Every structure is written in structure tokens, then in C-alpha cells.
A protein has these predicted regions:
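Acidic, gly/ser/pro-rich intrinsically disordered tails
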Residues: 1-6, 17-27, 37-40, 55-62, ...
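OB-fold and OB-like beta-barrel modules that bind single-stranded nucleic acids
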Residues: 6-15, 66-78, 128-135, 187-198
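Generic short beta-strand segments
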Residues: 16, 30-34, 74-82, 150-154, ...
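Short phosphate/oxyanion-binding micro-motifs
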Residues: 46-51
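Cys/His-enriched microdomains
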Residues: 85
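A general sequence property marking short-to-moderate contiguous segments
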Residues: 103-105
Length: 268
């Protein structure tokens, strides 16, 4: 099957860091990127740049400490992992699953030397294109639809075997697109998506695993999800009412339904 997993971001760099692997001649750069979209929302995706020659990595790091604007071309990477949280009552440790998501740059970020601001690039600052298969049950309510997409990775990251080169980002659609997604899509549907990468902080709750404690642990989670602006229905979709829905760009009004991330999360 054809592959598409591409991200183009323009924003202001913050919190850069450099790490080295023992015995390797290359380094990894990581940083956050403050991206302003045309709906005035600011997102903070995490970005990684692998395989940077050590001297070049330190040169870039010194530039990034000044918080410049930069252009990043990359792919969305998702990794299943876990994190440990501590119970405030008994001090016991509990492992919770997480889907770690970030953007992996496919080249060295282009650091802008001019005195630009995020608003100068709001129209073109955040663009995502994905081709993949719906791999979870759809959750839909009030014109908002949420699902995960299984995307074949075309860019090799590390020594990952070919049969494991998949990413599964969360997809969220609103308005007429959300309604049409709910009607046409089911697990196994293949779609081509254009949209923007959104980040939001959510407070999660989990019960302590200590059998002598019934406490609840509250912990923060940073979510990355793709907000669709257009969906093309390619295969295994319900085409029974072709043309019934008004397919349009939902990016301008998709945040009018929920005034805050907490309100949006409450529907699930």
C-alpha cells in the first residue's frame, strides 16, 4: 500500500537538549516547538532529530538556546510505553500505559535568522498528511469523532524491523467532517487525511495498585492528536450516501464546540 506520513511545522524553539549514545559518533537533538495556527491556538509538539554529527549538534544547540524560529519537516512517531506514578497516600508506585507521540525530523531543522514571529507563519505553520487504516472503534458525539489510524512508516527510525514500522496517531474530526467520519468509517477503513497536529495537557486518574490502599493517583499527560481539515475516503468505507454530507474545511470552527481541552476530553 502507498505510504504517507508527513509533517511540516514552523514555530519557536524552546527547551532544547542534546543526548549521546555510548560508542556512537552521532547525537540526538530534542526540543519543543511553539506553533501558532490560524485559529490562534498555540500547540507545543515535541521534536527529535536523530543522527546529528556531534559538533553540528552542539552548534545547533547553541542556536536553539536563543529560542529562534525554525522550519521542521518530519513524520509522526508513536511508541507504546509506560510511566511510573506515585500514590500520594501510601507512596506506592503504579505503572500506567501511555502512547508516546512526537515528531521525528527527516532532516536538520532550518533555523530562521530573520526576526520573524509565529504569527507571520500562522497560515502555513502546521500541516500534517497521513494515509492509513482505522484501527480502533470510533467514538463519536455531537459532531466530534475520535479514532486511531494505523500508518505505515516510510522513514526509517533507528533499527526498527520492517514489520514494526507502524505509527498509530489519534485522529479527531469536528463539524461536518466529524459527522461524515462517524457515518462512513469503521475499523479497517482506509483514509487519506490532511490536518494539523494539536497538543493538549490532560489530567488522568488511576487507582493505586497497592492492595492495602484505595487511593487515586492524579497525573498529567501530554496528548498529541491530528485535527482533520479534510478526509478522503479510499477503501472499506460506507459510500451508500455519497455526496449527502457537505465536506468542507472544518479547521476554522472545530474548536467552537469545546471551549477548553478539559471540556473536549469530558465527552470521552
Amino acid at each position: 500500500m502507498a505510504r504517507e506520513n508527513s509533517v511540516m511545522l514552523v514555530g519557536r524553539i524552546s527547551n532544547p537538549s542534546v543526548t549521546h549514545s555510548e560508542g556512537s559518533e552521532s547525537s540526538t537533538l530534542t526540543f519543543s516547538l511553539a506553533v501558532l495556527r490560524r485559529n490562534k491556538r498555540i500547540d507545543y509538539p515535541r521534536v527529535a532529530v536523530y543522527g546529528v554529527e556531534k559538533s553540528k549538534a552542539y552548534e545547533l544547540y547553541e542556536q536553539m538556546k536563543r529560542k529562534p524560529m525554525a522550519i521542521v519537516k518530519g513524520v509522526i512517531e508513536t511508541t507504546l510505553s509506560s510511566k511510573t506514578v506515585v500514590c500520594p497516600i501510601c507512596g506506592g508506585k503504579t505503572k500506567v500505559p501511555r502512547l508516546f507521540t512526537r515528531v521525528v525530523a527527516t532532516g536538520i531543522p532550518f533555523v530562521l535568522r530573520e526576526n520573524y514571529t509565529p504569527s507571520d507563519f500562522a497560515e502555513v505553520s502546521n500541516n500534517v498528511k497521513l494515509l492509513g487504516e482505522v484501527c480502533t472503534r470510533l467514538q463519536s458525539r455531537n459532531g466530534c469523532t475520535l479514532y486511531q489510524l494505523n500508518v505505515d512508516r516510510s522513514f526509517r527510525i533507528g533499527n526498527v524491523p520492517d514489520d514494526e514500522r507502524h505509527d498509530r496517531p489519534w485522529i479527531k474530526s469536528f463539524g461536518s467532517i466529524g459527522e461524515e467520519d462517524a457515518w462512513r468509517l469503521s475499523p479497517g477503513s482506509v483514509v487519506y487525511i490532511s490536518g494539523a497536529l494539536q497538543t493538549r495537557h490532560v489530567d488522568r486518574m488511576v487507582k493505586c495498585t497497592n492492595p492495602c490502599c484505595e487511593g487515586e493517583i492524579k497525573y498529567p499527560e501530554l496528548y498529541h492528536e491530528v485535527i482533520t481539515s479534510r478526509v478522503e475516503y479510499l477503501h472499506n468505507c460506507d459510500f451508500a450516501q455519497e455526496g449527502y454530507f457537505d465536506v468542507r474545511d472544518s479547521s476554522d470552527d472545530c474548536f467552537e464546540v469545546f471551549s477548553s481541552p478539559e471540556e473536549s476530553e469530558a465527552m470521552y
